[in-house]
């Protein structure tokens, strides 16, 4: 019963809506807040008096504002949106805290009479609440109960249409932005793009690949294949990288399983050409690995990740605590960490062949643009310290993924055309690299925050890096006459220019303060380090190869052709003199020695060593935060010490009258550690959510007398430790 004296101010800016009573309010007086639009961005629809709310312990706390949809993003604007007060230190200049790019929208649910329903296509009835699940694992709840009916129809229909329905490639905001934005950024930023012949020649020289390898221009104008890059290295298959001992990492696509006579003859001629090449030094020692027979399929990877991400798409704190008691069981059932473990193990096996056996490795996959990219990239990160620098890692992504022809457009399903092609292959690589980063932090110039924002950039359609299936597709869509701009030739931005998204202060979070550059050897030593057949230099653990093995492919050519033209190539073609447990011996031997952070790195893959990438997957869940804890506690202390060292260095330089220059490596001020938590730098200390003494799931188990140990664990009250 409401008191007759109860009054609600017309100037109210926020309301509290509870599940136990309904509060009737008049439309609040709103300040005019307009969205900040990028070049080429157009406002499509908007709705006023929308409440963005957070569900907690059965109650809703919300903020009143405006919900808008543009051809680039969905944005919620409140009075604080136009204010620069309390601006976070780590701020993205393109995507704000309450912004969702259209490509980042995963699923949209409407709430009808407290029941959720997936929204797709045309709507007959419009919901009173809207829940948006994002691919970066954010969850947005909007209440439309106090919004005008016509505005509800426009905003809901607009959001669903522009974020969930199939579209043409040229309709992406990528093209609108590129045609309207000024071309005044430095896209290369020390990153090798591998779009010129010189880039490939320089990479051959850097890795000291065999002198018989050659960068070619055969595919200029895409005369040979639209799938291949304009330039690549031959003679055998596609060259990826050369080890210091001369062994090479190669890749090729698999032959189709079903063939006619003409196709079979063509493939036999191709294999004869391979035989003539690999029967001579330095290719006669070659091991083939068909990744389709040793790693999960793309469908298995997609299924595992779909299950995995559901653990982090939390609607409210009640759901969080109800699943907390069985979280590890749910995690194991997704199989996501097991897939990461298998990929790391496979990369270690390949590294063992290159490093210990001095053997060339040929990776084979249906298209050679998915798991081949994952394994070849991981091997280079593990074996080449240059790939562990920021510019080196970015160059690696350009070489193996962007120029290598990974179908980002299809695998990320940016156009919403086919869910069958969707698979988080690139995200799988970042998860594997993160395992190495958290196991060996001093070995990497970049941080886990760098990997996190790189994963977020998959869904920011102002960069061309992750929005094409091949270099040919990109070149085709940039060469049209209709794409000329007034300021000059049409050019896309690359994600590697981090100044577009972050200012210098924020970019400091991408750089690892613990990293030390590899000391450069003397030129005299560098000249004597190159040998004609470096592959023949053996490590102490490397067994001596008998001369009879050099005729392996000549003796087994017919058998090799049958294998390739058959269903599948088997796993590694193992040498008879190779011990069966050579991988485990190599793995255990390496881990028993001190780590050289500029040398070979092998991931720890046993037991609980493979972990959840907490920063990426838990950063939006306040209940999972550690106040003043997590890796940020260590990083904050290190950065404070570095700041003090830098200030002392400034004083010393001033005494010697030397100019002090600033740059992106400037250390951010983080003195106020009381506001830090494990969510930092993506969020400061958020609301506390105390674990209930009796979790919801326990009530259901009270009548069951079994499993007393588990029940006792559920009754543990940790709330006193969180205060």
Predicted regions span which residues?
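Conserved N-terminal structural segment that caps and organizes enzyme catalytic cores in eukaryotes
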Residues: 27-31, 35, 43, 54, ...
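N-terminal cofactor/phosphate-binding cores enriched in small/glycine residues
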Residues: 78, 105, 109
């Amino acid at each position: 019963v409401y008191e007759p004296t109860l009054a609600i101010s017309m100037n109210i800016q926020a309301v509290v809506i509870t599940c136990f009573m309904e509060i009737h309010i008049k439309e609040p007086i709103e300040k005019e807040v307009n969205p900040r639009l990028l070049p080429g961005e157009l406002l499509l629809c908007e709705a006023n008096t929308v409440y963005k709310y957070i569900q907690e312990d059965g109650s809703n706390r919300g903020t009143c504002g405006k919900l808008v949809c543009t051809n680039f993003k969905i944005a919620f604007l409140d009075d604080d949106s136009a204010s620069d007060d309390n601006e976070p230190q780590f701020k993205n200049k393109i995507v704000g805290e309450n912004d969702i790019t259209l490509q980042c929208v995963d699923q949209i649910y409407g709430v009808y009479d407290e029941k959720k329903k997936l929204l797709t296509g045309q709507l007959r009835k419009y919901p009173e609440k809207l829940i948006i699940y994002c691919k970066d694992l954010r969850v947005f709840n909007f209440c439309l109960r106090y919004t005008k009916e016509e505005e509800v129809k426009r905003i809901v229909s607009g959001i669903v249409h522009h974020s969930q329905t199939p579209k043409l490639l040229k309709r992406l905001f990528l093209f609108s932005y590129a045609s309207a934005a000024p071309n005044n950024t430095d896209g290369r930023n020390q990153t090798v793009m591998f779009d010129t012949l010189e880039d490939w020649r320089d990479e051959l020289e850097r890795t000291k690949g065999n002198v018989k390898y050659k960068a070619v221009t055969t595919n200029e104008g895409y005369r040979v294949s639209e799938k291949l890059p304009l330039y690549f290295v031959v003679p055998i298959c596609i060259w990826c990288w050369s080890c210091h001992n001369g062994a090479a990492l190669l890749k090729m696509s698999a032959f189709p399983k079903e063939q006619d006579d003409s196709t079979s003859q063509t493939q036999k001629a191709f294999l004869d050409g391979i035989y003539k090449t690999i029967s001579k030094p330095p290719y006669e020692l070659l091991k083939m690995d068909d990744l389709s027979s040793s790693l999960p399929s793309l469908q298995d990877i997609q299924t595992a990740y779909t299950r995995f991400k559901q653990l982090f798409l939390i609607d409210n704190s009640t759901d969080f605590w109800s699943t907390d008691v069985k979280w590890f069981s749910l995690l194991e059932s997704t199989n996501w960490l097991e897939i990461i473990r298998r990929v790391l193990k496979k990369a270690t096996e390949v590294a063992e062949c290159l490093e210990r056996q001095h053997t060339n490795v040929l990776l084979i996959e249906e298209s050679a643009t998915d798991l081949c990219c994952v394994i070849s990239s991981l091997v280079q990160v593990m074996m080449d310290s240059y790939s562990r620098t920021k510019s080196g890692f970015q160059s690696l992504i350009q070489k193996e993924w962007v120029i290598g022809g990974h179908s980002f457009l299809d695998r990320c399903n940016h156009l919403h055309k086919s869910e069958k092609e969707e698979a988080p292959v690139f995200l799988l690589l970042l998860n594997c690299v993160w395992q190495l980063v958290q196991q060996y932090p001093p070995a990497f110039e970049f941080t886990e925050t760098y990997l996190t924002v790189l994963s977020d950039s998959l869904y920011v359609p102002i960069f061309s890096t992750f929005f094409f299936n091949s270099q040919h597709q990109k070149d085709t869509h940039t060469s049209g006459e209709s794409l000329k701009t007034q300021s000059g030739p049409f050019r896309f931005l690359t994600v590697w220019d981090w100044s577009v998204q972050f200012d210098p202060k924020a970019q400091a979070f991408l750089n690892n303060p613990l990293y030390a550059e590899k000391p450069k050897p003397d030129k005299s030593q560098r000249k004597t380090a190159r040998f004609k057949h470096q592959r023949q230099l053996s490590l102490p653990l490397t067994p001596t190869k008998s001369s009879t093995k050099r005729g392996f492919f000549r003796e087994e050519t017919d058998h090799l052709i049958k294998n390739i033209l058959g269903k599948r190539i088997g796993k590694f073609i193992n040498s008879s003199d190779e011990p069966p447990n050579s991988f485990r011996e190599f793995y255990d031997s390496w881990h028993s020695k001190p780590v050289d952070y500029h040398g070979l790195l092998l991931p720890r893959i046993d037991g609980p060593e493979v972990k959840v990438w907490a920063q990426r997957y838990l950063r939006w869940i306040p209940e999972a935060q550690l106040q003043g804890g997590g890796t940020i506690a260590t990083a904050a202390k290190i950065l404070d010490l570095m700041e003090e060292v830098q200030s002392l260095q400034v004083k010393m330089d001033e005494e010697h009258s030397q100019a002090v220059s600033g740059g992106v490596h400037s250390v951010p001020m983080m003195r106020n550690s009381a506001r830090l938590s494990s969510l930092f730098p993506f969020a400061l200390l958020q609301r506390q959510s105390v674990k209930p003494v009796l979790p919801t799931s326990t009530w259901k188990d009270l009548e069951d007398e079994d499993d007393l140990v588990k029940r006792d664990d559920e009754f543990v009250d940790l709330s006193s430790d969180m205060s």
